[in-house]
C-alpha cells in the first residue's frame, strides 16, 4: 500500500480465505518521496511538506494494515486497496478483454500517481499472473513478493536515470519475448494542468512504447483511468517540481475512500496496428487519443 519496505520477516497465517497473511511491521523512515532527491535542502523541503499534508494519514493506514495482517504476493494489492477504502468497479467482462495467453502490452493514462500502479496490479493480476508493471521505483519496495511484479522506472532527476532506463527497457522486452504481460503508463508522468485552475492533461506518450510493441509482436490493450489529482497538486505543479513532489503523499490520501472504475478497451485490431506502422510517434499520439476516448 505504501513505498516502505518491511523491516523483517513475520509469521505467515491464514485469513480463512485460503490466502496466507503476514503481520509485517513497515519501516516508517522510508515513507517519503524526499529520498528521490540527493540534494539535502530539496529533500528537507519535501519531507516538511509531506509531514504537514498526507504523511500522518498514511501512517495511520499503515498501522491499520499491520494490525489486520496482509496477504502476500498478488493478494497484497487488494488488501491494501481495501484498507484505503478504494473499491474497484471495473466489470469482469472488461477484464476478460485482456488476452489470456501470449505477449500483451497494457497501456493507460496516469491521472493520480502511485494509486494507479496499485490498481493496475490488482486488476491485471485477476486475469494474468505473469504481468510486470513499469512503475516509479518507490512502489517496487513494498511487499517483497508483490514488488516482484514491478519493474522500477527511475525518476527523471535520478542521477543514474539513463542507465536504469536502459535496464528497465531490456527487462520489459525480455518478459514480452517470454510471452508475458507488460503494463505501463507511456506518459511517464502524472497528468497535470497547463494552468493553476485548468483541467489535468495527459502528457504525450513516449515512442519507446511503440518500439517495444513492434519488436515484441505483442497485442495491445488500452485502459483509461478516470479522474485527476487535487487542485492543490495542480497549483503546486505550476509553482515548483519540489512542491509537486512533496504533495504526492497527499494525493494518496486524496484518493482514499473513492471508488475507481478504470475502463478496459478491446485489444487493438491488426488494421489499427498497421495504420501507423511506419510512424511510431504518430502511432503513440493516436493510441493516447484512443485510450482517453474509451467509454463504458
Residues of each region from the PLM?
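Hydrophobic beta-strand scaffold residues
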Residues: 88, 131-133, 182, 220
Amino acid at each position: 500500500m505504501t513505498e516502505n519496505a518491511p523491516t523483517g520477516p513475520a509469521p505467515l497465517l491464514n485469513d480463512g480465505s485460503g490466502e496466507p497473511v503476514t503481520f509485517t511491521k513497515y519501516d516508517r523512515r522510508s515513507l517519503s518521496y524526499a529520498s528521490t532527491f540527493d540534494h539535502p535542502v530539496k529533500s528537507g523541503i519535501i519531507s516538511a511538506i509531506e509531514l504537514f499534508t498526507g504523511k500522518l494519514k498514511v501512517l495511520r493506514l499503515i498501522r491499520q494494515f499491520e494490525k489486520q495482517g496482509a496477504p502476500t504476493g498478488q493478494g497484497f494489492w487488494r488488501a491494501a486497496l481495501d484498507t484505503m477504502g478504494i473499491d474497484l468497479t471495473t466489470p469482469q467482462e472488461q477484464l476478460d478483454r485482456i488476452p489470456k495467453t501470449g505477449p500483451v502490452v497494457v497501456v493507460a493514462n496516469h491521472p493520480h500517481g502511485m494509486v494507479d500502479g496499485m490498481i493496475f496490479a490488482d486488476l491485471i493480476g485477476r486475469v494474468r499472473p505473469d504481468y510486470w508493471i513499469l512503475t516509479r521505483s518507490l512502489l517496487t519496495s513494498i511487499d517483497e513478493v508483490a514488488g516482484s511484479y514491478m519493474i522500477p522506472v527511475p525518476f527523471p532527476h535520478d542521477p543514474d536515470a539513463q542507465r536504469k532506463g536502459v535496464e528497465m527497457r531490456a527487462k520489459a522486452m525480455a518478459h514480452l519475448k517470454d510471452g508475458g504481460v507488460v503494463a505501463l503508463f507511456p506518459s511517464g508522468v502524472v497528468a497535470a494542468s497547463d494552468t493553476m485552475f485548468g483541467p489535468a492533461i495527459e502528457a504525450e506518450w513516449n515512442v519507446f512504447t511503440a518500439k517495444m510493441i513492434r519488436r515484441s509482436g505483442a497485442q495491445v490493450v488500452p485502459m483509461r483511468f478516470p479522474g485527476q489529482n487535487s487542485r492543490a497538486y495542480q497549483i503546486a505543479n505550476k509553482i515548483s517540481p519540489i512542491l509537486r513532489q512533496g504533495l504526492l503523499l497527499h494525493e494518496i490520501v486524496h484518493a482514499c475512500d473513492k471508488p475507481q472504475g478504470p475502463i478496459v478497451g478491446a485489444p487493438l485490431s491488426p488494421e489499427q496496428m498497421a495504420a501507423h506502422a511506419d510512424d511510431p510517434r504518430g502511432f503513440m499520439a493516436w493510441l493516447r487519443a484512443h485510450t482517453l476516448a474509451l467509454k463504458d
